[in-house]
Design a protein with these regions (language model features):
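N-terminal secretory/targeting leader peptides
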Residues: 2-11, 17, 23-127, 154-347
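A gly/proline- and charged-residue-enriched helix-loop-helix capping module
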Residues: 127-145
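Short, glycine-/small-residue-rich phosphate/pyrophosphate-handling segment
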Residues: 151
Length: 347
């Protein structure tokens, strides 16, 4: 049986790394980061396993950036929630205890509701549409820098979460009525809670690392995620009914301490951003390959892939846009994102 250590374990890991949760910036001297003759270590938190495309792309980013800077910078990637849940590590970045993290959009929308524009059903039509938008600096900079002054967080870019679907432990879901009474794990987001409610289920926010055990024990009846996470986290073992709702193209964000980004020499910062852009491309390529492999693995394991009533779910979700896009900025950003959908492949 899989279990997740209590949150205090995350703090013990932080302590063992010589980090602090207060504003001493995790021991980094911003006046000397990246100096010749020394290595500046950046700790990057990830909630995925070592087999996940995000981990692979980040490890390769680390190697390239270390080589490009002659060893002056080294990114250390900590997978599997070793440094804490996404909610915890976002606070660690904010306080300076660690330097970077990959977090979901739901975490950022809890800090600034404008992020929910990129985190709602119907925003993106495809992964290519999504990645084209994320690379559009003119469009994204006001949002991505909105937490810099208040929370010391810069959003650097994002990794696709792919297309998200429902999966359940007992019985196929074809229409919203089939989800009635079922407890479905969602991320801690008011919009995602409402999304599952509109789709017919009972939304249950829960940490990602606890989902397997919760479904195994019957605390949950299902969850929603992409095929890669569905298989790499072995959720298909306990929830073998996969309904192709395709209700959302999700996004993970790379967040970084804003003061550290500003403290980097201009050439190092440019190198880092170039290598990050390459990491986004690599991640998307890996994602597409891994999605197909995950589908084949799940199918071989006996997963029941269910075609849903797409029209019924589309109608059920229709109210969410008017409910959550409540400001001119949000509505204008949504329309700009939709207008950027050219149907072409992302770089």
């Amino acid at each position: 049986m899989r279990t997740r250590a209590p949150a205090v374990a995350s703090l013990l890991v932080i302590a063992s790394l010589g980090l602090s949760s207060c504003a001493d910036l995790g021991g980094l001297d911003l006046e000397s980061v990246g100096d010749e003759g020394k290595t500046t270590y950046i700790k990057l938190a990830l909630n995925q396993a070592e087999t996940h495309p995000s981990y692979i792309a980040l490890e390769n980013l680390s190697s390239r950036f270390e080589e490009a800077t002659d060893g002056r910078w080294k990114i250390e990637v900590f997978p599997n929630e070793q440094l804490g849940s996404q909610q915890e590590v976002l606070q660690f970045v904010k306080s300076g205890a660690i330097e970077m993290a990959i977090v979901s959009g739901t975490q950022l929308e809890n800090m600034n509701k404008d992020f929910q524009v990129l985190n709602m059903p119907t925003t993106f039509s495809s992964i290519d549409h999504q990645m084209t938008v994320i690379r559009d600096q003119d469009l994204m900079e006001p949002l991505f820098q909105s937490l810099a002054e208040s929370d010391n967080i810069s959003v650097i870019g994002g990794f696709t979460q792919g297309t998200r679907n429902l999966y359940t432990t007992d019985g196929a879901v074809v229409t919203p009525a089939d989800l009635s009474g079922k407890k479905v794990r969602v991320q801690e987001s008011a919009m995602h809670i409402r999304m599952i409610e509109l789709m017919g289920g009972s939304a249950t926010p829960l940490s990602y690392g606890e989902v397997y055990t919760a479904m195994q024990s019957g605390v949950l009846d299902g969850a929603e995620n992409n095929e890669v996470s569905y298989v790499t986290q072995n959720h298909h073992e306990v929830a073998p009914f996969h309904s192709n709702t395709e209700h959302l193209v999700g996004l993970d964000y790379m967040v970084m301490r804003h003061d550290l980004l500003e403290a980097m020499e201009a050439t190092d910062r440019e190198l880092f951003l170039e290598e990050w852009d390459a990491a986004m491309t690599e991640h998307t390529d890996l994602w597409n390959t891994e999605t197909e492999a995950a589908f084949e693995r799940a199918e071989a394991a006996g997963v029941d892939f269910v075609q849903v009533d797409e029209q019924a779910f589309a109608e059920a979700l229709a109210p969410i846009r008017d409910e959550f896009l409540t400001t001119d900025f949000q509505r204008n950003l949504f329309e700009a994102v939709r207008a950027a959908d050219t149907g072409e492949e992302a770089p």
